[in-house]
Amino acid sequence: MLFGYLVGFLAADPEERMTSGGKRVVVLRLGVKSRVGSKDETVWCRCNIWNNRYDKMLPYLKKGSSVIVAGELSLESYVGRDGSPQASISVSVDTLKFNSGSSRPDARGSDEGRQRANDNVSIGFDGESLDTDSALDKEVYAGFGEDQQYASEDVPF
């Protein structure tokens, strides 16, 4: 199993579909920017959200939204419009979060819309609820605000 984290922008609003077996899936088309040499490239990924996961977030996911996705990655092949073989990345989404570090101001929308999006929306890992107003105002990471003292023998290399 290949597991990965992707950070990117939605290329379109989420699409809700039903499989032939009657299972519900919401598809996100995610553009992930990467730099190859001096050239920027965008890798397009299809992110599948199965069943009713993240339903509270879906009304706030719009084209241009910056998101963080974690899940099982798979590579799929298909024949392009010109007849040449192509490859795409597919993600079975385990975790979906809004990316508060978005560099696109239009992706967030108005302050009122952002406030509605932050109200009681489960956006954390394993469905934990976060106080997004305070999280947007400060950097939060492991050990944030703690005074760390390391001795040279603590470093393993």
UniProtKB/Swiss-Prot annotation:
Keyword entries, A-Z: DNA-binding
Domain of life: Bacteria
Classification via InterPro entries: NA-bd_OB-fold (IPR012340), Primosome_PriB/ssb (IPR000424), ssDNA-bd (IPR011344)
Transcription in keyword set: no
Keyword Ligase in annotation: no
Domain SSB span(s) in chain numbering: 1-100
One function term, GO molecular function aspect: single-stranded DNA binding
GO BP terms, alphabetized: DNA replication
Annotated region described as Disordered, given as residue ranges: 99-131
GO CC annotations, alphabetized: nucleoid
Segments of skewed composition (Basic and acidic residues): 105-117
Summary of subunit composition and partner proteins: Homotetramer.
Annotated NCBIfam families: PRK06293.1, ssb
Name used for this protein in its record: Single-stranded DNA-binding protein
GN (gene name): ssb
